Design a protein with these regions (language model features):
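Active-site region of glycoside hydrolase catalytic domains
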Residues: 256, 262-399, 409-430, 454-457
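Bacterial Sec-dependent N-terminal signal peptides
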Residues: 18-40, 107-128
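An active-site-proximal structural segment forming one wall of the substrate-binding cleft
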Residues: 166-186, 200-232, 236-290, 315-330
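Solvent-exposed, low-complexity, repeat-rich "mucin-like" stalks and linkers
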Residues: 37-66
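Surface-exposed binding patches on compact interaction domains or structured appendages
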Residues: 58-85
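A short beta-strand micro-motif common to beta-rich folds, especially ectodomain repeats
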Residues: 96-108
Length: 517
């Protein structure tokens, strides 16, 4: 073999090695981004007898799954490339209707699939409740309520500002018209951001307190029951880029840091002491609601599921601080009705984790929850139809009439039948731009109101004043003049029928049988 050939061979080998190393280096720098897509869930709504649930997902990295309830257990899972199939076994249900979450995780990606199971004795179809029960009488006095949304709860640059979200100033005429329309109560959400001084006094701005008091006066003169609260001071939102937007009522921080929790409780005590003192002489028409939608930004499916109950315990502490602060001011506040809400005001999480505060006043606490199920229909307008007559391709795969009945029946069993009044502090459904979709919207709202009355609860529509159509457009009445927005009168009429009709032939069943076709 010649020296030239040997050298040429060596050069070729070196070049080949360089090429291989180059390719290897290039390939290793291309990393697949994590993703998670749910392909199918079958079935998502279980019969009482139980059975198997199959969930198929596509993901990178390979997904894992875990149930948050003991009655659903993982039986097996198989993976091939990016596809994973999970099989769960659900036990037979011997009690009330129930639901559970199955968390699917792939790297940093996570989703929760809600599985529902019917009651073994159809308790979701309970007859109308005895309206002579004390808790029902209280709820019935609140009746059908209207939220003055995106008003005193609005804020810009972390400062509360009544007109910053598009509504003009609310007037006495507004609430007179609300009463005339058929509502019996008004919930007045209040944000206090930028209106509170530094520690240790946390003095509330006098002008802002006066404006809140002025709107409460409007409600009183209109003959409406009224609820005021601390609203967006606890708002939290996790943005798509991961940015965690939150404010001083930081449930995550408080659960991790005792000093932060102590500081939050001191501010909460000071603020509710001042609010209660300002309204000490107001009569029973006025209710205080301590907090609103406190959560970690994931709406009940975040770190609250993995922190061993710390956030639930912190929220229970905050609610106790609220009750103690109000009661200590005396006067009418010694026995004023107070609204208590659980984690993110979820009915399910409230029932599971809320510990009702100790209260020196007897039977003066109310439970507040919110209901927008399914949010993809009620809030986001991703689906145009709802209920058993909706086209499968145009409605969400869960959250129909049976789900609603189960949720309300569970609240009835947990609270109303035990003497604790319940009000649905927020519910609603956004306006659509066509008659067919509006028919399903009105059916949904009528059904919610009828189900609330049937189960002995009050219910409040969320009106944010937005006169458009689509996502977050839930205006029924102009917030300055009280005039109707779009088909607001028609929508209010079906809700008042749903809540107030005493016709014995008008039931949830008859309403169901007359759903839009």
């Amino acid at each position: 073999m010649s020296t030239k050939f040997i050298c040429l061979k060596n050069v070729m080998a070196i070049l080949l090695s360089i090429n291989i190393l180059s390719c290897s280096s290039s390939n290793s720098s291309i990393e697949e981004l994590p993703y998670l897509t749910v392909k199918s869930v079958s079935p998502q709504n279980l019969a009482a007898a139980g059975g198997e649930i199959t969930i198929r997902v596509s993901s990178y990295p390979i997904a894992t799954a875990q149930s948050d309830a003991g009655w659903i257990t993982l039986k097996s899972n198989t993976s091939s490339d990016s596809l994973t199939s999970f099989t769960f076994t659900a036990k037979a249900n011997k009690g009330n209707a129930r639901e559970a979450g199955i968390t699917i995780t792939a790297g940093e990606k996570e989703t929760i699939i809600i599985i529902t199971q019917a009651a073994n004795n159809e308790q979701e179809s309970k007859p109308a409740i005895d309206e002579n029960l004390p808790a029902v009488k209280v709820a019935k006095e609140l009746g059908l309520g209207w939220n003055l949304g995106n008003q005193l709860d609005a804020h810009v640059n972390e400062i509360a500002d009544e007109t910053s979200w598009g509504n003009g100033k609310v007037t006495q005429e507004t609430l007179l018209k609300v009463k005339q329309a058929g509502f019996t109560s008004v919930r007045i959400p209040v944000t206090w951001l930028g209106k509170v001084g530094e520690a240790p006094h946390y003095h509330i701005d006098t002008d802002w307190m006066n404006r809140v008091a002025e709107v409460v006066e409007y409600a009183e003169k209109a003959g409406l029951k009224a609820i005021i609260n601390i609203h967006n001071d606890g708002h939290r939102h996790i943005h798509e880029d991961g940015f965690d937007e939150h404010r001083w009522l930081d449930i995550v921080g408080a659960a991790q840091n005792k000093d932060m929790n102590t500081a939050i409780k001191e501010q909460l005590k000071s603020m509710w002491t001042q609010i209660a003192q300002r309204f000490e002489n107001k009569g029973e028409f006025l209710i205080f609601e301590g907090l609103n939608e406190i959560h970690d930004g994931r709406w009940g499916s975040g770190t609250n599921t993995t922190d061993g109950g710390k956030q639930y315990a912190i929220l229970n502490e905050w609610q106790q601080v609220f009750v103690d602060a109000v009661r200590a001011t005396g006067g009418n506040n010694a026995t004023r009705y107070l609204g208590i809400s659980g984690y993110c005001t979820s009915p399910n999480l409230t029932i599971k984790h809320l510990q009702l505060p100790t209260d020196p006043a007897q039977d003066r606490l109310l439970i507040s929850v919110h209901y927008y199920d399914p949010a993809t229909f009620a809030l986001e307008d991703k689906f145009a139809e709802w209920g058993h007559t909706g086209a499968p391709s145009k409605k969400e795969s869960w959250g129909d009439e049976e789900h609603l009945k189960k949720v309300f029946a569970a609240l009835r069993t947990a609270y109303v039948e035990k003497g604790i009044p319940v009000y649905i502090g927020e519910m609603g459904c956004v306006h659509r731009n066509n008659n067919r979709s509006e028919a399903f919207r009105k059916y949904y709202l009528e059904y919610v109101c009828k189900a609330a009355r049937t189960n002995g609860m009050a219910v409040f529509y969320w009106d944010n004043g937005n006169a458009g159509a689509g996502r977050e457009c839930s205006g029924l009445m102009n917030h300055t003049t009280g005039t109707y927005v779009n088909n607001g009168k028609d929508v209010i009429d079906v809700m008042t029928k749903g809540y107030f009709s005493n016709d014995p032939s008008y039931t949830l069943e008859s309403l169901y049988n007359n759903a839009p076709q």
